[in-house]
Amino acid sequence: MYHFFPGGKQELAVQAIAHTAERYRELLDRVFAKSTDIGQVTVTWFNWAARALQETDYADGCPIGTVACEPASSNEALRQATQAVFASWQSRVAAELIGAGVPTAQARRLATFAVASPEGAILLARAHRSTRPLRDTGRVVADTLRAATDRG
């Protein structure tokens, strides 16, 4: 292991975060490529997360969120890695909103809301053993983003 990851377990963990983030980013890109309706994209994303959670019997949530909640709180390299992932997702969503005519400052705030919302909804879904928190939250986020783009 140390041959490929001279920094040991920490370097391996940071690389795993980067790899996982890239997979999620590719998925997000595919979802955005299928629709120009930010609301539909949002519902699709939340529904995908709900299905994935249900398929694992509520055992798996967002792996980036899991690392951000626990190990990253005591490890600066992991905190920075998870922060970079969330920032890249926020930038991606903000770019879509800006492209739809939403003012930059508002788009950034909405992107933070859109990225933070599934994390909380996943926690509730796991606690309730139900996909309803994800599906309900997805609809609210979708409606909020749609309203912003309609005014944009």
In which residue ranges do the predicted regions lie?
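Hydrophobic alpha-helical bundle segments that form small-molecule/ligand-binding pockets
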Residues: 35, 74-76, 86-111, 147-152
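Hydrophobic alpha-helical connector segments
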Residues: 15-18, 28-60, 110-114
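Amphipathic alpha-helical segments used for helix-helix packing
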Residues: 40-42, 56-80
